[in-house]
């Protein structure tokens, strides 16, 4: 899948990474909409987000999409639901450090952290 990566402060690229794999308590959401967050994304790109100094990292935490797969213990969502997510606990792309990743074709969301 494609995702937006900041390989180093001041640089942005679209990178091909593996589609994330969900666990029993997660859902896979196909991204349909994203929004740029000036308070977060612009600071991450500039290398000025407090406490973040490890690159490359994935951008985006304001995203919405459609649930395409659910883990066997997910109770709050089913395939076909529309969902919005917040921060992603584990982006899941090798070599990319981030708690974000909303600017990806697919995101993993935890059952207890997502709204529909």
Across the structure, where does each feature detected by a protein language model lie?
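Extracytoplasmic/periplasmic beta-strand context in beta-sandwich domains
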Residues: 1-2, 15, 81, 105
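Cytochrome P450 core scaffold surrounding the K-helix E-X-X-R motif
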Residues: 38-45
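Short beta-strand-to-turn element immediately C-terminal to the catalytic PLP-Schiff-base lysine
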Residues: 6, 45, 68-69, 109
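Conserved hydrophobic/aromatic beta-strand scaffold that supports enzyme active sites
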Residues: 14-16, 64-66, 106-108
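Glycine-rich beta-strand-centered segment in the early N-terminal region that forms part
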Residues: 20-36, 48-92, 99-101
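NAD(P)H dinucleotide-binding glycine-rich loop of Rossmann-like/cofactor-binding domains
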Residues: 89-116
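Extracellular beta-rich ligand/substrate-recognition surface
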Residues: 4-12
């Amino acid at each position: 899948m494609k995702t937006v990566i900041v390989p180093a402060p001041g640089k942005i690229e679209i990178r091909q990474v593996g589609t994330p794999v969900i666990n029993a308590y997660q859902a896979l959401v196909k991204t349909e909409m994203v929004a740029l967050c000036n308070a977060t994304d612009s600071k991450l790109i500039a290398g000025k987000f407090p406490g973040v100094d490890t690159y490359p990292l994935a951008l985006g935490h304001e995203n919405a999409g459609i649930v395409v797969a659910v883990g066997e213990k997910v109770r709050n969502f089913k395939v076909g639901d529309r969902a919005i997510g917040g921060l992603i606990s584990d982006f899941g792309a090798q070599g990319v450090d981030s708690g974000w990743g909303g600017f990806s074709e697919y995101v993993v969301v935890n059952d207890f952290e997502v709204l529909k």
